[in-house]
Amino acid sequence: MDVIDPDRIRELEAKTGHDVIAINQALEEILSDEAKPFVNMGRTSADTTQTAKALQLKSALKVIATSIENLRDILLDKSIERKDIVAMDTTHLYDALPTTAGRPFAHYAEMLQSGLNHLKYAYENSLIGKWGDATGNHHAATVLGLDGMQLQETYCQMLGLKHMTASAQTSGLEYEADVMYAL
């Protein structure tokens, strides 16, 4: 998918007025003549758009996770730098018990790590691609003599995405909810 220029897709979409047609046309431009007739066979708009959304989220989660990891590491460094500095902790805006100036930094670093764990789960389990036709039953693949489930699995693996084993026209929103919760 990296060989398809997003600017080319936008250019084609401006001409066609349809995002999926533009993606299919961009795919056809890079495929062999033998493969071109099959670009849209057995796929629906939802197959294309949901897979594209998963790929966008995959890229975004990488950027977000890297930023959070960097911030966590900075906080851990600050925690270590301040571990021997005595400070007064507070509760309800009143002085409480002595602590170190580094403890709050370590606390926030731990909270960020918890968020990273949620992001990692969403990244590894909730980015769903599909290629299953209008009902998710892979009828068109069967007509072509292909194993539709294997086609979908291979397609999604090549993109670094998970796939549903019992798909429908659209995948459930639970997967997107996992990602939103993690964020």
Question: What residue ranges belong to the model's regions?
Answer:
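Metal- and O2-centered redox machinery and metal/ROS homeostasis
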Residues: 158
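A conserved active-site cap/scaffold subdomain adjacent to cofactor or substrate pockets
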Residues: 172-183
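A helix-coil-helix interface module used to build multimeric assemblies
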Residues: 1-138, 146-154, 163
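Active-site-adjacent structural elements in folded domains
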Residues: 163-174
